[in-house]
Amino acid sequence: MSTVQTVLGAITPNLLGRTLTHEHVALDFEHFFRPPPADFERELQAKISMSTLGYVRMYPYSSKENVRFYDEEALEAAKKDVLLYKKHGGGSIVENSSYGLKRNLEFIVDLAKSTGVHFIAGTGHYIHAVQDASHASLTVEQMSDLYSKDIITGIQVNGETVKCGFIGEVASVYPVHEFEKHSLQAAGEIQEVLGCGVSLHPHRVTNAPFEIMRLYMEAGGRANKCVMSHLDRTIFDIDELLEFAKLGCYMQYDLFGTECSYYQLNSTINMLSDGQRIDNLMKLIEEGLVDRLLMSHDIHTKHRLTSYGGHGYHHIHMNILPRMFAKGVTIEQVEQMTVTNPANWLAFNP
């Protein structure tokens, strides 16, 4: 029987409930720090407060405090927001922090125990630039062995065995680095063997999702068990989205709540608003693709948590879904995207 592997053990897919398929509750994002504009350096070096929050929202990666999404203040704020997510109908969170992002399995397990939210942890590798020497030198075979071990055997956390429930997020730059080609190959090989879900992170150019799907599928990975993340900052043209949809993977809009006029990680991108995200999802639903769609926030900086003036993990449930209903999306379509699709993606029989 197929089950979903949470950090507290395997459960049947019907127990997941509403699921956020791409989140982080603790990670190190300091590699992506960008020096602040000279005129705002003082404000962005200061502690995040009401008087500096506007600067942080405009330049989120220029505040070192903001990208330190792992200190005690961040963990406390994340836990508060997971509890709010639970209060407002959330059932499960897929934690996408992979090797290179310094995932905190101990904290994830604690959250699962203390909040009642199901957490699914990932294995896999983030981009080459954030890997330490012990991981940067891994071969495809060694990566495959590691991913398989994390899922089948598990990892010891304070005397408990914690098993990963999917491979991801597997991240790459563009052109794809040789190390990242290896991690995509390993992900495809292990997916073919185990049948588990995979989550891919493309670089911020339109060609990237097509290229990494090719590499993953050539290694044996099944498209219908793979999620392409961050499409709301990668493929903007609907015709190109429909062309990409022919590959058969899940298409994920996972930056809900990120509404900014200047996207620091690629200044040529006009970041979508939540309204535009909804409109794009509705167009894809009209094309018969509701069974391929997923939604999330990809929270990875402090300013997106409610303790720092942000929207929290309950934003989709409280603010986006009501707007979707008002625009004509049905409850059945929402349930498909937030309950059924995540369960189908995550369920496997190891």
From Swiss-Prot:
**Which GO MF term does the entry hold, naming one?**
hydrolase activity, acting on ester bonds
* Database matches in Gene3D superfamilies: Metal-dependent hydrolases (3.20.20.140)
Give the protein's cofactors: a divalent metal cation
- Give the cofactor binding note: Binds 2 divalent metal cations per subunit.
Q: What is its EC number?
A: 3.1.-.-
- Record-linked Pfam families: PTE (PF02126)
Q: Which residues bind a divalent metal cation 1?
A: 22, 24, 169, 298
Per its UniProt entry, what is the enzyme's top EC class, as one word? hydrolase
Q: Which GO terms describe its biological process?
A: catabolic process
As for family, the record states:
Belongs to the metallo-dependent hydrolases superfamily. Phosphotriesterase family.
Q: What is this protein called?
A: Phosphotriesterase-related protein
